[in-house]
């Protein structure tokens, strides 16, 4: 036994080198039944990607430009000289559509009407009746389809950058947030629930309440949360000088909204254009009423609205026209009332979240001292408390600063903010 043990120790000190059979055997360990086919597919993918890179010739760069060594300025200059500018026209009719000898009637503004054919680079399926096209100046052949003409002021209403307001920044509006999410988010995220029940999802919300209760703030939170296109319209923007301009802007606004996959249109201060119709004998409000009637028609008229959600905000719902408020146009009316004690406490905590405050400040006590206050009033209290700390050259805000601010804003400004007119706004 001792001799065998010594032999094992010698083998460990002088290990035998592996031959090719041993190496091949070790390579088979850990291989699954599909290892060979996976390797084959990986090799094919590698070869195909190499082939694609060879065909492209230029790798994508951050600037979108090729390397200077691959620039061909002479041919680019020649191409720019040969390429002629196109003229804008409108295709009014298609003769013999879906055939090889299809012809197109185009109307070139202030010149004439022509019957023309298609250019070499245009597909017949790209051209429809009524759309704008680009035609050359010699044969007037259609060279390119153009997007619909939309007023730049309407295009600028689209909110490109998402606001930094979230639902957590809206205090005292728990019930209102739930109602808003049911209308805006649920149909976009889970449309199958409405299909199973066989009902159409609500498409419009009217937010009404006293000034400063968070109507526009909640709309900004909706814009932050959703991935849909968000269009913000202020009511006074649609009141134009010339007859028909406001109605045209509304038409183009909804035309742009229908071209998006999903869209939310927010009308702020809608009482500027949505007032009840009446005859004042002068006719000064006729244009505003035409604009409102165009909105009424676009919301639920002859044509379907599509996947467009409409939010409206006002603090004077009693002045709005009944045709605008009927279900189908605005399905839900969400009231933003004055926040209760719990809501005011939450609003205090939201506004002091970024402030340097002392610990153990009794926000519930401060909320009790601000009865019948809106969220805007409480924000003003927090700002005024910070001003007291700056005056005293302190780096933190104390509870006494908040109490002084409450006395100044809530008690001192009472004649401005808590008038009976605002308390019984409706």
Swiss-Prot record:
Transmembrane stretches in the record are: none
GO molecular function (one): proteasome-activating activity
**Can you list the GO cellular component terms from the UniProt entry?**
cytoplasm; nucleus; proteasome regulatory particle, base subcomplex
Q: Where does this protein reside within or beyond the cell?
A: Cytoplasm; Nucleus
List the Pfam families.
AAA, AAA_lid_3, PRS7_OB
Chain positions recorded as ATP binding sites: 209-216
Keywords of this entry: ATP-binding, Cytoplasm, Nucleotide-binding, Nucleus, Proteasome
InterPro entries according to UniProt: 26S_Proteasome_ATPase, AAA+_ATPase, AAA_lid_3, ATPase_AAA_core, ATPase_AAA_CS, NA-bd_OB-fold, P-loop_NTPase, PRS7-like_OB
Q: Which family does it belong to?
A: Belongs to the AAA ATPase family.
Which protein, by its recorded name, is this? 26S proteasome regulatory subunit 7
Specify the species: Spinacia oleracea (Spinach)
The encoding gene? RPT1
């Amino acid at each position: 036994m001792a001799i065998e043990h010594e032999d094992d120790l010698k083998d460990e000190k002088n290990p035998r080198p592996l031959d090719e059979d041993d190496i091949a055997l070790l390579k088979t360990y850990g291989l699954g039944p599909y290892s060979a086919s996976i390797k084959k597919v990986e090799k094919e993918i590698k070869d195909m990607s190499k082939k694609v890179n060879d065909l492209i010739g230029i790798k994508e760069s951050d600037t979108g430009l090729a390397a200077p060594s691959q620039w061909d300025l002479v041919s680019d200059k020649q191409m720019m000289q040969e390429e002629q500018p196109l003229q804008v026209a409108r295709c009014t009719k298609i003769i013999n559509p879906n055939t090889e000898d299809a012809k197109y009637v185009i109307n070139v503004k202030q010149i004439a009407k022509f019957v023309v054919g298609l250019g070499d680079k245009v597909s017949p399926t790209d051209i429809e009746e009524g759309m704008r096209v680009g035609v050359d100046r010699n044969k007037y052949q259609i060279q390119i389809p153009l997007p619909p003409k939309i007023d730049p002021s309407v295009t600028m209403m689209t909110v490109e950058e998402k606001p930094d307001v979230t639902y957590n920044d809206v205090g005292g509006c728990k019930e209102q947030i739930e109602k808003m999410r049911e209308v805006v988010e649920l149909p976009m995220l889970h449309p199958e629930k409405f299909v199973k029940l066989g009902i159409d999802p609500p498409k419009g919300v009217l937010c009404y309440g006293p000034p400063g209760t968070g109507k526009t703030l909640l709309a900004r939170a909706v814009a932050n949360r959703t991935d849909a296109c968000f269009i913000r319209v202020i009511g006074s923007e649609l009141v134009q000088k010339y007859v028909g301009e406001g109605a045209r802007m509304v038409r183009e606004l909804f035309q742009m909204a229908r071209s998006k996959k999903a869209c939310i249109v927010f009308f702020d201060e809608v009482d500027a254009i949505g007032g009840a119709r009446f005859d004042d004998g002068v006719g000064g409000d006729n244009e505003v009423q035409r604009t409102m009637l165009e909105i009424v028609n676009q919301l639920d008229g002859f044509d379907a609205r599509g996947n467009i959600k409409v939010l409206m905000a006002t603090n004077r719902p009693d002045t709005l026209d009944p045709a605008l408020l009927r279900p189908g146009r605005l399905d839900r009316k969400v009231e933003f009332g004055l926040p209760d004690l719990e809501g005011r406490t939450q609003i205090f905590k939201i506004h002091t979240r970024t402030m340097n405050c002392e610990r153990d400040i009794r926000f519930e006590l401060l909320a009790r001292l601000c009865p019948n206050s809106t969220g805007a009033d409480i924000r003003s209290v927090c700002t005024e408390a910070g001003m007291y700390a700056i005056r005293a050259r302190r780096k933190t805000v104390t509870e006494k600063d908040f109490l002084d601010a409450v006395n100044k804003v809530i008690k001192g400004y009472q004649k401005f903010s808590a008038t009976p007119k605002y308390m019984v706004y409706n």
